[in-house]
Amino acid sequence: MITYVLDSSAALRYFDDGAGADRVEEVLTACASRRANLTISALQWGEIAGKLRKRFGESDEIRLLNSLLPSEATVVSATADRAVHAAALKVDRNIAYADAFALDLARASPEHILVTADYGFKAVDDLARIEFLPAK
């Protein structure tokens, strides 16, 4: 079964109803109907929370976070091993640390697909399956 890895940029496109929001909704629906799995790293989840709080305030942040992920989705903790893997990706491939956590999750198997609107991942698309949402 496919496992989608959601990047914060994809989630924010969804909230903004931006380019690719419909694709993110398809991914969320596939997870809710158990046709696919969905994961997001705790660091990416935190990025989403911070951006929502800054834009909408605390009460809307919590409401929006609760509305995003189906209960079947998994927020993956930043373990010591994951932190070391992400650090290596950050240094070796010159990507942001939080992005390295998402990339590390996407590298778990050939059935994992990172969904993102961040074209900075083009520099590492040789390491994992990456689905890029349309440019704005």
Could you describe each region identified by the protein language model?
Residues A11-L12, W45, F121-K122:
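A generic structural signal for short hydrophobic patches within well-formed alpha-helices
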Residues S59, L64-T79, A83-V84, D92, ...:
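Short acidic, glycine/proline-enriched helix-loop-strand junctions
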Residues L6, T39-I40, S77, Y97, ...:
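Short beta-strand scaffold positions
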Residues A73-I113:
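Active-site neighborhoods of divalent-metal-dependent phosphate/nucleic-acid chemistry enzymes
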Residues M1-T3, L103-K136:
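Acidic, PIN/NYN-like endoribonuclease modules and their adjacent C-terminal/linker elements
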Residues M1-I40, R53-N66, K136:
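Short, well-structured N-terminal submotif of metal-dependent ribonuclease cores
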Residues R23, E47-I48, H85, A123-V124:
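Phosphate- and divalent-cation-binding pockets in alpha/beta enzyme and binding domains
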